[in-house]
Amino acid sequence: KIPDSIISISSGYVIVVDKQHQKIYVFHKNSSFSKVFEAACSTGKNPGSKQVAGDAKTPNGIFFVTRILTNPGPTDVYGSMAFPLDYPTISDKRAGRDGNNIWIHGTTKTLLPTQSKGCVVLHDNDLKRLAQYIYFNKTPVIISESLKWISQDKISPVKNELERILTSWHKAFVEKDIKAI
């Protein structure tokens, strides 16, 4: 089974964070999906999606890693490297959400669930393994409160329905048909 949030990925790697279960996964898509990485993680101390700076929430959404920071600070807190995400995105800003410095980073401390200030934290050894799957501004990072798992044989019908909805929405948008949107 795979998370339903990745069915539109055409190829390559996708990183998925499940805040409810405090897990991070990497899936690879060729002709089908395969899980290539799984580890425990820690997300924000407070539940829900990030709204404002300092709320100790991890944002939900689709993000991209923008760069790597080596030796970003004390290794017990940040590990040996950090991968900043592009939060807040344009849609976050339009929705009035702010904040900054949302990273995927390591730690050498004991990893406890929901203990970050909003980042996605892994044990440093797991972060080093995760790093091989990260391509800057290319590998999507999907952060979700919880994942809905579907079997791969259900992908085509769900994907077709999503494409139908998006096509319909796009047509209504282009034609300025507000009622249809």
Task: Please place each PLM-identified region on the residue numbering.
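Exported/periplasmic cell-wall-interacting domains
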Residues: 55-60, 69-167
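Cell wall/extracellular polymer interaction/catalysis modules
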Residues: 1-101, 155-156
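Short, well-ordered alpha-helical segments enriched in acidic and aromatic residues
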Residues: 177-181
